[in-house]
Each structure stands twice: as structure tokens, then as C-alpha cells.
Amino acid sequence: PADDDGDYYQIAMLIEHLKAEDINLRVTATRSLPAIADALGPDRVRAELVPFVNDSTDDEDEVLLCMAEQVGKLTAHIGGKQHAHELLVPLEQLASVEESTVREKALDSIQTVARCLSPEQLTDHMVPLLSRLTLKEWFTARMSACCLAPPTYALLLQLLPPTAPAAAAPPEKDAAAGGGVGAAARAEVREMFKKLCTDDTPMVRRCGYGD
């Protein structure tokens, strides 16, 4: 953490600039989220910084682009992997916005966070996130869901593999092979992906075919 008056003053200014009217100040401050998080410490990151970011996802695209990139870098500042899923909340919102560059950065950060999750966090937080995106009315969220389904499924196979010797068992045999939470989560992701691949919106379907 920052340990002298100059550093603390600089961090205090960055925190103030997160709320500034000048977009350039907000962009610079948002780009410094990891430094701010390092100065605040994990408890305040969870109690103050993450909720602030959650409430700040209705901003200009330039700010959101920085936010989508930097939030994924906060995994080292949130107090351990057991809290990493808390970063998915703002990233889920950013994965639904209209601007494609913001969504792409948000998807990268979601996958960065997802790779830090335990099996329980994956089923309790990542799969429900995917479900919410799949069911959203706005098609950009469903496009993001389509992009996230394959890597999420791969993580489920990695962290909660089928117990049968052949991990590449056909999907219809997955439940019998693995049983339990892992098989149920994989089945849920498969159903979501099937739904997205037959979506009414061509752009959503194309995301599915591409993956």
C-alpha cells in the first residue's frame, strides 16, 4: 500500500477524479483502479470500491472501456480468490452495453476472474451470470452470453470433471458419467448455448456459430 503523504494525496485525488465532471479525469482515474485498490486495501475495496464501480457503469464509453479492462486486474486486490466473484457484478453490466469494444474487454475480464474461481464459485456465480445474460431482452447481453458459454463449459469440465475415465463423454451421457453439481451445471450451460444458437436475432446466432 501507499506509505507516504505524497502517495496518499495522489490516491485521494484519483478517487475524487472517479466522480469528476471532466471525462478525461474520469478516464485517467479509472485507468488507475488497481493503484487505488492497492492503497485502499482489500476490505475497503470490497466495501467501497467495488460498490462504487457497480454504480458507475452508466458512463461514457471511454470510461467504461477502461473500467472493463481494469476491473479484471483487481483479483489481486480484493482479499483472496474467495472474494473474486464479487468482481463479476460490474463486469456483467459492462458485458451488456451497446458498445462492442467495451463488451469485448468485459468478456476478457470476466474470463480472467472466472479462472480464479473455485468450483463452488463457478457454479454459484458464473453459471447464474451466464443465465442472466442469456435471458436479457437486449441482444448485446445475449451475444456476450454466447461468447462466454464455451469457456465456462470448459472450466466446468476442468474443475468439476466427469468421474468416468473418458472426460470427453458425449453430452447426453455426461450426467450419468459425472453426476452431481458439475454435471447439472454443464447441462445448464449446454441448454443455454442451444437456446442462444437458435436466437431470434441473427447477430446472437452468429456468435454461437463462431464459437
Residue ranges and their predicted role:
Residues K19, T30-G41, V53-N54, V71-G72:
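Short amphipathic alpha-helical segments enriched in leucine
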Residues L33-D38, M67-I78, L94-A95, S109-L117, ...:
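Hydrophobic residues within the alpha-helices of tandem HEAT/HEAT-like
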Residues P1-S32:
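N-terminal "cap/leader" segments of large eukaryotic alpha-helical scaffolds
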Residues V27, R31, A47, D61, ...:
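Alpha-solenoid HEAT/ARM repeat scaffold
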Residues I23-N24, D43, D61-E62, K81, ...:
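Alpha-helix N-cap/helix-start positions at coil->helix boundaries
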Residues D4-I15, P42-D58, K81-A95, E120-T134, ...:
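HEAT/HEAT-like alpha-solenoid repeats
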Residues E104-L107, T112, M143-C146, L155, ...:
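Long all-alpha helical scaffold domains
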